[in-house]
From Swiss-Prot:
Keyword tags: Allosteric enzyme, Cytoplasm, Hydrolase, Metal-binding, Protease, Sodium, Stress response, Threonine protease
Organism of this sequence: Aliarcobacter butzleri (strain RM4018) (Arcobacter butzleri)
PANTHER family: ATP-DEPENDENT PROTEASE SUBUNIT HSLV, METALLOPROTEASE TLDD
Regulation: Allosterically activated by HslU binding.
Subcellular location, principal: cytoplasm
The enzyme's E.C. designation: 3.4.25.2
HAMAP family in alphabetical order: HslV
CDD domains (alphabetical): protease_HslV
Binding residue positions for Na(+): 161, 164, 167
One biological process term in Gene Ontology: proteolysis involved in protein catabolic process
Enzyme type, top EC level: hydrolase
Name of the protein in its database record: ATP-dependent protease subunit HslV
GO MF annotation terms: metal ion binding; threonine-type endopeptidase activity
Amino acid sequence: MFDATTILAYKGKNKAVIGGDGQVTFGNTVLKGNATKIRTLYKDQILAGFAGSTADAFNLFDMFEGHLEACKGDLLKSVIAFSKEWRKDKVLRRLEAMMIVLNKEKIFILSGNGDVVEPEDGAIASIGSGGNFAISAARALAKHSSLDEEELVKESLMIAGELCIYTNQNIKILKLED
């Protein structure tokens, strides 16, 4: 259940975009095909998406939003404060969820054990069972196509939906623009 979804984020030149599929599974059963796993945070200045347990993810969203408020929307400071709290709390360390958070300047993956990872290229991140398919497609499309950020995320998630049985093609997208 921890990885059964796909979230892809792309921080381009003109937009920051996050997208996710809508499939919710329990074991080998599809429970829902149109779930929303992405949202905006802190005055619509931060994009976030989750993979993993829905209940755990909502708790993490609430906690992270508290850190964003305390840090006045500073994404880097919020991520560091959130990670410190996550690692110190025994209950949090057992939560089965991962998050991607981004704004127009930075992008981070928050792992299930409290690690913070900034993608090597600083532009593309993915989580979930179809994450490797989506990020591979996104990197190829970024390098060899003229798709804008939103189209690139959608097309990459559609490709992941063709390959990953835990990912569908009911794609939702959120973006931040200049």
